[in-house]
Amino acid sequence: MQICWCFREPGTKYLAGYKPLTELLTEFYDDGRKIAAICAAPSVFSGLGFLKGRRATAYPSFMDVIERDGAMTSTDSVVVDGNVTTSRGLGTAVDFALSIITQLEGKEKAQEIAESVVYRA
């Protein structure tokens, strides 16, 4: 996982317009590196075209934004489609983190961490 962040408005608006970040995201996406965003941040991915034709999710008030940009929206807590992981918000943050850990370190490591924080799915 190369980039992972969570911002809400107006932060995502500023991030979407910050050229060094969008260039880096595009480089990572084009190289097939794993990228992840939660809450409103998936709208930055969709604005860059990363979610077009992909399953994705976001904070409820941003679902229309990512759908308008071509995402196939889902209300799942976490959606992994290829190298892109998206999640809905604070209430799904543990699921999001465990998904990323699973992708990077495997299911056993994610289970170990879930147990260490007394997480119950």
Q: Where in the sequence are the language-model features?
A:
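Active-site-adjacent pocket-lining segments in enzyme domains
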Residues: 1-121
